[in-house]
Amino acid sequence: MKRYTLGASVRMDGSDLFGVDKKYRFLPIYSISGLWRISNEAFLKPANQWMDNLALRLSYGLQGNIDKNTSPFLLGNYSNQTVIDKNETIITIGSAPNDKLRWEKTASYNAGIDLSVLKSAINLSIDYYYRRGSDLIGYKDLPLENGFSSQAINWASMENKGVEINLQTRNITCLLYTSPSPRDPK
């Protein structure tokens, strides 16, 4: 097994669901990751009698999200309502248009360690993750003299972090002792 592994990915995504300004339509999405297999280092060779794998993992990535319920344009909802005993078709405008809407972004960080011992009878993985969402689309109240009650804008953010622990064991897979079967009295 190799000691070091690096990985990377880059792409450009675009959408016409965002603002009219072209600079908001595209988002570079990328990730980078690395792994150091510590168990293959010379200073750990004596431990390889009982330790099968010890590895440290790190990664970072940026991804985008499209909120398909928003639009940079003025949108209306058609509905039928009864007005003075007549059925009338009306258009209700949801929110003010925003030509500066852009991608929601999520940056993800991850650090982890993997350990396998006793011919992979015990496997342990511990991961720390941190995710930060920015430019999340939400509705902000507007002054009522605008004629609109709210507008979709990129203003929210959110953080998520935690630790994940995964322990797997392979229990005894063979029978160590079997009792003799009773003999047939014939």
Spans of model-derived segments:
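Extracellular/periplasmic, surface-exposed regions of secreted and cell-surface proteins
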Residues: 1-179
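A short, hydrophobic C-terminal helix/tail in secreted or cell-surface proteins
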Residues: 180-186
